[in-house]
Amino acid sequence: MSTFILGATGLVGSQIVKVAESSPAIKSITTLTRRTPDFANSSSKLKTLEESDSSKWSEIIKSQAVSSDVYLSAFGTTRAKAGSAENFKKIDYGINYSSAKAAKENGSKVCVLVSSMGANASSPFLYMKTKGELEDDIIKLGFDHTVILRPGALLGERKESHGLGNSIAQTIGNWTKGTWLQGLLKPIDASDVGKVAIDFAQKGINGELKDKVIIVGGDDLVKLANSLN
C-alpha cells in the first residue's frame, strides 16, 4: 500500500508519518511540505517533496505523478496564523481541496481527512464553517472511501504555535483528560489520531470498509484509539 500525506510536519501529520513508517503494510510514503521535515531520510520507504509556496502543491502532485493508494491530510491553519479570514479560507479550504482533487485525479482510492470537532458548513463560526465546507466538497470528489476524523482538543507538543485559542484548548484538554469533564472537549493524543487514520487507510484498501463515507466524531475517535492501543 502506498500513501501520500499532506500536513506531515504538523502535530497530527507527523504522528501519521510515524505510524505509517512502522506499518509493514505500507510500502511507500510520500509527503509534501513547505520545509525540510525532521523525519527526512528516516526511512527507506519515505519520499519527501518540498515547496515553500503551498499554492503550487496541487500542480506538484500532478507534475510529480504522485500516485498513491491513500491520500491523507492533516493540513490546516488558524485565522490568527493566516492573518485574515480570507487567507485562512484560501489556505485551509483552498489548498486542502485542490490537493485532494489532484490526488483523486492521480488515482488515489481512499481519502482520510483530519478535520475538527464541530465542523459544519452552516456554522456561523469561520473555523467550523470552513472545515464543514471542505468536508462536503471532498466527499463530492468521489473517492472509493472518504474517512473524516473530527478530533476534539489535540494533545501533544506542537513545534509551532497555533494561536492562543488552541493553546488554551490544549491546556484544558490536558487537565480534563481522564475526568468527567473530558466529555466537553473530548481530548485525544495526536499519536492516537495518527493510529486511527492509518488503521482506516489500511481497511479502506483491504476492502474492510462497507460505507463510502465515514465520519468519526470525538467520542468514537477516542474509543477507536483505545481499541488500537
Curated annotation (Swiss-Prot):
GO terms for biological process: import into nucleus. Its main location: mitochondrion. Keywords: Membrane, Mitochondrion, Mitochondrion outer membrane, Transit peptide. It is a peripheral membrane protein. It is found in: Mitochondrion outer membrane. Residues 1-36 form a transit peptide. InterPro entries: Him1/Fmp52 (IPR014843), NAD(P)-bd_dom_sf (IPR036291). Gene3D superfamilies: NAD(P)-binding Rossmann-like Domain. One of its GO terms (cellular component) is mitochondrial outer membrane. It holds the Pfam family HIM1. Belongs to the FMP52 family. This is Protein FMP52, mitochondrial. The gene is FMP52.
